[in-house]
Amino acid sequence: MSKKVKTTPDAEVKEETPKSKLRETLEFLAPIIIALIVAMILKYCIFANAVIPTGSMLNTIQKGDRVIASRLEYKFNEPERFDIAIFKYPDNEKELFVKRIIGLPGETVNIVDGTVYVTGTDGKTMQLRDDFVSPENKDSYNGTFVVPEDSYFVMGDNRDNSVDSRYWTTTNFVSRDKFIGKVMFRYYPFNTAGKLE
């Protein structure tokens, strides 16, 4: 309890106690601590922030672009064909990769002279649109991949310069539990900021 000290007949001054200093410090630190907790929740539970280190997703995403992915998207929804996803690289899980989902669980991906065909679980074959791939980046790669359950086949849009499901050594697929999030938005550079598809 603070003592009241008379200074003049008309005024009183309260002596400062250690308790009021502690309270003042806590009042100062509380908003900072709350802001840090909110930032940690946003970063590790809701959003993933990434800088694109290579040109493997040209022309959709440029080298050096900064993107935000939703960590919640694949917690509540299944990955879909053509999603751009961040995931743990199967050959070294300490690295994160960004690619486009091409083949879904149970499907067969057949690449003939750079054209991608997917045979669904219903037996129907479709040629995938590749209008997001520049004509000069359509390579002559050939290969057939049967996508296991709970796994996905992914490719970079810059197919001539992408280390993706076609070339990995550990496995050619990304398992469901290795996805970090769905890339939703490019926020840098500012002149190209916007939703990504």
Residue ranges of each PLM-predicted region?
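Flexible, glycine/serine/threonine-rich loop segments and coil->beta-strand junctions
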Residues: T54-G55
